Amino acid sequence: MRPMTRKTRIQPIEHAVEDDDNGYDRPSKSQLKREMHALQELGQALVDLPKDALKRMPMPEDLADAVREARRITDHEGKRRQLQYVGRVMRSLTDDETAALRTALDAQRGVNKAATARLHWIERTREQLLASDDALTEFLRQHPDADIQEGRTLIRNARKEAQQGKPPRYFRELFQWIKAAGGASDSDDEAAGDAGDDHDDEA
């Protein structure tokens, strides 16, 4: 009796998928698109910064030039093209440079958040002082070092100029009085809507 021979099925050789020449996964198209979009947003955030804050951003000179140019352009289409260019320059940054920019922007946003909250408090307090004499009593109780006579004079004059439709001189001065009494920093805007254009650039 002839011995039975077992047929061995030859399995196909599975070739290892080569990620790339360097042995790591190449980013997918969707990942690259997300990264490009994130850099574009970062560039837009730089363009939107107040000029004093922009000076503190750790930017290479070519990026700084591109951002300043984008801030100067007022034409919608021209600005859109320049923002795209800012995004291209952003993509040339190293990871460390990008990380440094993000860190600086996050710090600036924290400062802005605190300053905005303080600004809103001053505005609310001013409205309360103009609306009720009792508000001044409460304010002075909380801020005993404030100049009482000056505060009363400013409130009286601000009410009068509002009734007469005059320019809001004392209205603005009352803002400054509240800011000084409340210990707010000098970086606060003088009044909502009364600040200068933050996007004016140096000559």
UniProtKB/Swiss-Prot annotation:
Top-level lineage group: Bacteria
Disulfide bonds: none
A GO molecular function held by the record: ribosome binding
Amino acid composition bias (Acidic residues), ranges on this chain: 186-203
Residue segments, region Disordered: 1-31, 183-203
Keywords: Cytoplasm, Ribosome biogenesis, RNA-binding, rRNA-binding
GO biological process, one term: assembly of large subunit precursor of preribosome
Location within or outside the cell: Cytoplasm
Alphabetical list of InterPro entries matching this protein: DarP, DarP_sf
One GO location term (cellular component): cytosol
Keyword Transport in record: no
CDD domains, A to Z: YjgA-like
Major localization listed first in the record, in broad terms: cytoplasm
Described purpose of this protein according to its UniProt entry: Member of a network of 50S ribosomal subunit biogenesis factors which assembles along the 30S-50S interface, preventing incorrect 23S rRNA structures from forming. Promotes peptidyl transferase center (PTC) maturation.
Cross-referenced NCBIfam families: PRK05255.1-1
Family: Belongs to the DarP family.
Protein name: Dual-action ribosomal maturation protein DarP
Gene: darP
